[in-house]
Every structure is written in C-alpha cells, then in structure tokens.
Amino acid sequence: MLDIKKIRADFDGVAAKLATRGVEKEKLEKLHDLDIKRRELIVKSEALKAERNSVSDEISQVKRAKGDASTQIAAMQKVSAEIKAIDAELAEIEENLNEIIIMLPNLPHESTPIGADEDDNVEVRRVGQTPTFNFEPKAHWDLGEDLGILDWERGGKVTGSRFLFYKGAGARLERALYNFMLDEHGKEGYTEMITPYMVNQESMFGTGQYPKFKEDTFELKDDRGFVLIPTAEVPLTNYYRGEILDGSELPIKFTAMSPSFRSEAGSAGRDTRGLIRLHQFHKVEMVKFAKPDQSYDELEKMTANAENILQKLGLAYRVVALSTGDMGFSAAKTYDLEVWIPAQNTYREISSCSNCEDFQARRAQIRYRDEDGKVQLLHTLNGSGLAVGRTVAAILENYQNEDGSITVPEILRPYMGGLEVIK
C-alpha cells in the first residue's frame, strides 16, 4: 500500500510514476481531493471537541455555583451533534479513500524499465548454451505421456483441465527437484519452513493479492473464508504480520516448498497443454525481510540464488527486467528468469524475483526497530526458487534423447537413487 504522505507531498511525481503502471490521474486526483477534505474535517472535529470540553468545564463550574447551566447544556448538545455528523462524514470519506489507495499498485523503482507490457521488458543477460538436437525435439507433454510419467487424461478425469498425475520416475523427479532446491537455498542461509496451505483474507491483503486479484484464487465457501495459497510468499511474508522485528537480525531469509493454487482467470486458451500453466503446482519460494538501505543488494542476491539452481541443472536461461506495465501489483522492481524450452523455441518464465520495498510491509504492518530505537517499516522481497513443474518441463525437453528417454542431470542423480536415464 502506498504512503498517503508521499502522495500528498509529491502528487505530480507519484501520478507520473503510477501512469506508467496504467493508473489514470483522475483516480489519484479523487484520492487527493478526499485527503484534503478528510484533513479539513479532522481539524474541524478537533476544534469542536475542544469547544465541547470547554463548555463541559463551564457546566461543571455553573453547577458547583448552584447556577442554571441550561444554556451551556444546550450549547454542548449542539456541538456534540455537529461532532457526530462530522465524524460520520469523516468515516465515509476514509472508507472511500481507503477503497482507492488499496487498489493502487506499488511505485516503480527508478531502475525499472518504463513500458506498457512484456514487449517493453529489457533483457539483462543470457546464461548457458541452448541445446542442439539432430532430431526434432518433442514437447514435454508428449515425452511425459510416452514415458508413462505424466498423466493428464486421468488428472482431467479425477478433477478437470489443468490437473495431472505425476507417476513413477515423474513423481520422483518432481520430488528430487524440490529437495535439491531447498538444500541449495539452505546453503545460502535461508531458513526452511513448512507453511499452512490455507490462509485467512487478512494475509491475502497483506501481500497484495486481495482485494484486487480475488478472482485468481480458490476461496473456501464457508464463514471463515480461508484461501488456498497461490504461492508460499503469502504465509511466509505474513509470518511477521503486525510485529516489530529487531533490526540487528535483518535480513531474515525464509524458503518453503508448497503447492500453489491458481484459478488462472483470464488465461483461457493459453498453455492449455503441459506443465506451464496449471491450477495446482509445486513451487519453492524465497522470502526476505530487509532494511530499506539493503533491499536492492538483497534482490540481486536472491536473483543469483534462483540462477544458481538453473546453472547447477545445466539449463540455459535469460534474466529479464520487467517493465512497469508487466510488473506485479506489489513489486517496485522485478527480474524474471526465463528458461529455454526447445519445443517452443523460446524462453519461458520459471522464476520472478521482486523487491516490494515497504508496500507489503505497510499493508501487513511489519516493522523493525533500528539501532536508534526508531520503529519503521522494513522492505519485503520474494522470489521463486523455482517453479517445480516448469523445471520438470525444462529438464524433459532439454535432456531428451532421440529414443524418447531422458538423461537425468548429474546433480539430481543422488536424489533419485542414482537413476541416470528415465526410459
């Protein structure tokens, strides 16, 4: 959530930055007008409350003197009625103001490329050689079905579209990958967590999924309204919701593997086959809590942690800085890692690493006490390390052989009982 004080102090600057994220200036002007009216009413209310206190003192003095306080009582009743009316108007204005501000995205960092959509993203670097084949490479869904390790037909029968069964070596490969990822992040100082797979709506608000992206989630239809997590970012970030941390302990780094549940609203017709876009998938997440002056260094380190996984798996990838028009709601800066998918002859997203600055911390009220004892908002960061199903897809396609078998990357073989080839 944005700081209303920042909007107040630099309205034109904030409006210009939000315009690059598709926010119309009229919306911000309405917010600005409501804020002015709100502050005027607060001043008026406080003045009337001071007047009411003064009249109350007069009434006490008159009564002590055995006098007639009816005039003062009438005056106080009039003032009290005015205060009640102002406070009611103030509550309505604050509700309207809040409805606007919670729907505004984060301000982009100065280094974030300005653009309308993914076409304006900027490639930062490419790492690794894309493989060459002396045969026509198959898509991972065909490879998985032919090997009997991925079963979409029965996944569709049991549940519906965008669901599948991993079977045999396929299930073992998935498990090997997330265990490998967690081990690697543990070496980098991340504390491994197992989180709840359902969260309350306050948690979804804290990280910015609610209310704007409610349609993208699966929510339980009961009086509790729990939500199946779209990413472990939600429970990990909200772990410290409403708390004040010791600044000397920052940065704090968490990692977790969890299922992620997404309705994929608006994705009809996109990636209808394969592991790229599912309603349920495993993902290893990284989350950091950092001091504001250290958060961008921590973003680079987090991105390097995600890259480390791809490098050790021997997968070619590129790093892309997302434009203001393509970046997620809560992010100030985001790097996407895109892995090479041979059958599609292109790079596809496998990780997003973002610095949300104090945007989520303000919504979730996560603060720290600095060395001077001052309490202030910290910065939150999150990143995929990695999306496991998409990593399976990348391995199947990049490590496929002409006979349809899959060579298991060397780094994973100890996690798969020494298995060298899936056939």
UniProtKB/Swiss-Prot annotation:
Chief location bin: cytoplasm
The keyword Transcription is assigned to this record: no
PROSITE patterns linked: AA_TRNA_LIGASE_II (PS50862)
Ligand binding (L-serine): 231-233, 285, 384
UniProt cross-references to InterPro entries, sorted A to Z: aa-tRNA-synt_IIb, aa-tRNA-synth_II, aa-tRNA-synth_II/BPL/LPL, Ser-tRNA-ligase_type_1, Ser-tRNA-synth_1_N, SerRS_1_N_sf, SerRS_core, tRNA-bd_arm
Gene Ontology BP terms: selenocysteine biosynthetic process; seryl-tRNA aminoacylation
CC terms in the record's Gene Ontology section: cytoplasm
Pathway: Aminoacyl-tRNA biosynthesis; selenocysteinyl-tRNA(Sec) biosynthesis; L-seryl-tRNA(Sec) from L-serine and tRNA(Sec): step 1/1
Keyword list, A-Z: Aminoacyl-tRNA synthetase, ATP-binding, Cytoplasm, Ligase, Nucleotide-binding, Protein biosynthesis
Keyword Ligase part of the UniProt annotation: yes
Reactions this protein catalyses: tRNA(Ser) + L-serine + ATP = L-seryl-tRNA(Ser) + AMP + diphosphate + H(+); tRNA(Sec) + L-serine + ATP = L-seryl-tRNA(Sec) + AMP + diphosphate + H(+)
Binding site for ATP: 262-264, 349-352
Locations listed in the record: Cytoplasm
GO-annotated molecular function: ATP binding; catalytic activity, acting on a protein; serine-tRNA ligase activity; transferase activity
Known EC number: 6.1.1.11
Its job: Catalyzes the attachment of serine to tRNA(Ser). Is also able to aminoacylate tRNA(Sec) with serine, to form the misacylated tRNA L-seryl-tRNA(Sec), which will be further converted into selenocysteinyl-tRNA(Sec).
Domain notes: Consists of two distinct domains, a catalytic core and a N-terminal extension that is involved in tRNA binding.
Similarity remark: Belongs to the class-II aminoacyl-tRNA synthetase family. Type-1 seryl-tRNA synthetase subfamily.
Quaternary structure note: Homodimer. The tRNA molecule binds across the dimer.
Protein name: Serine--tRNA ligase
Lineage: Bacteria, Bacillati, Bacillota, Bacilli, Lactobacillales
